[in-house]
């Protein structure tokens, strides 16, 4: 198993407090990873600039700016385009997955989320970033 790079940061973005808390609890399985949170799309963009996360777990349906728009902006900016973005959403229609792909998302997970699967995905994506 490849250890995560010390100091790697994961940004969790969800407007639902319970969902955000659940994601934070899941990330406790990765104690070496720094976790920051945002509750809407505008706050997420601010945190992307401020905290330079290695990975963003991003809800789609949020106030102020959708996850689709956040992802587009992250991937369009040369300073942030290498940030890994994973959509974590209740939307699971093929058209939603396709739209997320068009925005540049690196992966897509439908809620409800299984803890071990999410932790393993985050661990693997962060390990891949250390090799690149």
Predicted regions and their residues:
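Receiver (REC) domain active-site loop signature in two-component systems and cognate sites
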Residues: 62
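Acidic, metal-coordinating helix/loop segments flanking the phosphotransfer/catalytic sites
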Residues: 37-55
